[in-house]
A protein has these predicted regions:
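N-terminal signal-anchor/signal peptide hydrophobic helix marking the start
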Residues: 1-8
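Long, compositionally biased, intrinsically disordered regions
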Residues: 11-152
């Protein structure tokens, strides 16, 4: 009887430890994904990129960072349109430049009423774990939302 109770306690302890470990791993996963999403959104909407004339390059190997801004939170329409045009052919390379190699991502620029003005990337499926970062920007002289989704 004592052996049965001891085995029961050991099984419960092992199961509890496994659940706690899974919970910690999931929290770590979301924290890392959140950090990557915030960093990518900051680079995109607050910087011009490096070099700041990256739109003139045909090859991403010369691009250290991709920024869409004319100035902080004011997006350059030409840069946005160039990135959107590159979506089909250069998505994987753009992910790498943004530091999102382990994830997929998308962004969209919307009117305040959620009407989409521009979008880039791959949309997540229903089962994907997704982090959203929303920023307020100026685009085409109008206040809009910039929404970045990072998922796996």
């Amino acid at each position: 009887m004592a052996l049965t109770v001891l085995l029961f306690i050991l099984v419960i302890s092992a199961t509890s430890f496994g659940l706690i470990q899974n919970s910690l791993n999931e929290e770590e996963f979301y924290a890392e994904m959140q950090e990557k999403a915030v960093n990518a959104s900051q680079v995109l909407v607050a910087t011009k990129g490096n070099p700041d004339s990256w739109v003139k390059l045909n090859d991403l190997t010369g691009i250290n960072s991709i920024g869409l801004a004319k100035e902080n939170n004011v997006l350059d329409e030409n840069k946005v349109d160039t990135l959107v045009d590159w979506n089909a052919l250069k998505y994987a390379e753009i992910k790498e430049v943004l530091g999102l190699q382990k994830y997929d991502f998308y962004f969209k620029i919307t009117e305040m009423d959620e009407h989409t003005v521009r979008e880039f990337g791959i949309l997540p499926g229903a089962e994907e774990k997704t982090i959203l970062v929303e920023r307020y920007i100026l685009f085409q002289g109008t206040e809009r939302k910039f929404i970045l989704g990072v998922f796996k």
